[in-house]
Amino acid sequence: MHGFHDVFIQILLLLAISVSVIAIAKLLKEPDSIALVLVGLVLGLTELPIIEDAERYITQSEVFQATIISLFLPILLGDATLKLPFHHLFSQKKTVLGLAFVGTFVSSICIGTAAYFLLDLPLAVAFTFAALMSATDPISVLSIFKSLGVPQKMSTVMEGESLFNDGIAVVLFKIASIYLLTYMEMGWAGLGSGVFLFLKFAIGGALVGLVLGYFFSQVIRVFDDYPLEVAFSALLFFGSYFIAEHFHTSGVIAVVVGGFVFGDYGAKIGMSKETKTNINTFWDSVTLIANALIFLMVGLEIRNIDLAGNWGVIVGAILIVLVGRTIAVYLGTGWVQELSSKERLLINWGGLRGSLSVALALSLPMDFAGRDQVLLLTFSVVLFSLIVQGLTLKPLIKKLGMI
């Protein structure tokens, strides 16, 4: 108990550091996620006895890393669905659907195939890594867009793509990390089984989210009590996730669909303006803490990454992911006439990898063959994405004249 108390105090200290970094980043009008990663890198590279146990607990504890998925994902995804008005999403449906569905599959196939042949990774490892790299994280991008006054269209596209491709990427991640080798041995029958499993995950998760989203939308019609309605939203997010996972479908897709129903239909029939404001404020605060811990953890993980002798494969992985993203964007949106070449370029470079990729990588079982390789490449690409792409995004937007 005494040891847990010490670790808790140290994690609290890390949270205090995180919140302080966020406050300073906001004063400087810089993306707080990038600032957190940079501070995490500094903390990870220096040995400070006062937070050493907390660093070890965050980066090596199986319990903590399992908690990341079951606790943080419903929070991050649920909050995002509440923030994106459905009519905004519908107005950009062609671009969002092209990126989220065509783009995610193309990205996964390109990255997985290249990683297998060029990086000489085992098949399951290559496509597990590819699934992780197919999920985008718009947090840093949206904060930059907001600070510069980039048109709402681009924010809607980036956030809409992320919400849908996160669900697809998680399903692909599960198939690649658990079932891929078995299906490969089955030949064409395995391909059919893989497609069936994907549809089961996706459709089953969507149905769970639809039912629970509708149910809680009806429930909040009865009450005009925002603390209670906040509690109902939490029950929806976590309930959707765990019920879907219990029935071996996609918890991520369940949260996204349930959140959209609740945030759009539920808000129209059962939320006062005050309630909607307070629900958004509550989840803003919770999401800030969750993201702070995840992005700080990305930086802290540097002490567990063996860079020596791996620079070649790391650079190769970064290039493969960048090329895979480019192919995915142009194939996924090539038929969308409303999208300009400048907008495609911004979408391409703004497809950062972040918290979901990290959370999924850490959730891999310790006995997964190639876990260390996946962690090495995932954290390396995420660091490059957040720091290099993130810090060059603002100059790119100005260069393209999109403000």
Swiss-Prot record:
GO molecular function per UniProt: potassium:proton antiporter activity; sodium:proton antiporter activity
Record topology, Extracellular segments: 28-30, 87-98, 146-167, 217-218, 263-281, 332-372
Keywords: Antiport, Cell membrane, Ion transport, Membrane, Sodium, Sodium transport, Transmembrane, Transmembrane helix, Transport
Subcellular location: Cell membrane
Main location: membrane
A cellular-component GO term for this protein: plasma membrane
Activity response to pH changes: Optimum pH is 8.5-9.0 for sodium transport and 8.5 for lithium transport. Na(+)/H(+) antiporter activity is detected between pH 6.5 and 9.5, whereas Li(+)/H(+) antiporter activity is detected only above pH 7.5.
TM spans (from-to): 7-27, 31-51, 66-86, 99-119, 125-145, 168-188, 196-216, 219-239, 242-262, 282-302, 311-331, 373-393
Effect of D224 to A/E: Decreases activity. Increases Km for Na(+) and Li(+)
Membrane topology: Multi-pass membrane protein
Family, per entry: Belongs to the monovalent cation:proton antiporter 1 (CPA1) transporter (TC 2.A.36) family.
UniProt name for this protein: Na(+)/H(+) antiporter NhaH
Organism: Halobacillus dabanensis
